[in-house]
Amino acid sequence: MAHKKAGGSSRNGRDSHSKRLGVKRYGGEVIRAGGIIVRQRGTQFHPGDNVGIGRDHTLFAKVDGKIVFTIRGRLNRRTVAVIPS
């Protein structure tokens, strides 16, 4: 009778799904109110004028308009604003 000893178990072999984070609309683009601008973990980008922040730190447009990325303040924070059209 042919026998094969059982192989050992591995502690690898898992992976999480990608979270699709990042900038979704870039500077100069036109966006509708409610449109997502940035998906992020933490505040890599901070909300500026006419931009809201969700509880998962997603930045979204509060009004229709054009997106502007700027660096502001003493701490050189990257901010995103929407200029109403």
Curated annotation (Swiss-Prot):
Pfam families: Ribosomal_L27. Keywords: Ribonucleoprotein, Ribosomal protein. PROSITE patterns: RIBOSOMAL_L27. GO terms for cellular component: cytosolic large ribosomal subunit. GO terms for molecular function: structural constituent of ribosome. Gene3D superfamilies: 2.40.50.100. Residues 1-24 are annotated as: Disordered. One of its GO terms (biological process) is translation. The keyword Isomerase does not apply. The keyword Ubl conjugation does not apply. Belongs to the bacterial ribosomal protein bL27 family. This is Large ribosomal subunit protein bL27. It comes from Nitrosomonas eutropha (strain DSM 101675 / C91 / Nm57). The gene is rpmA.
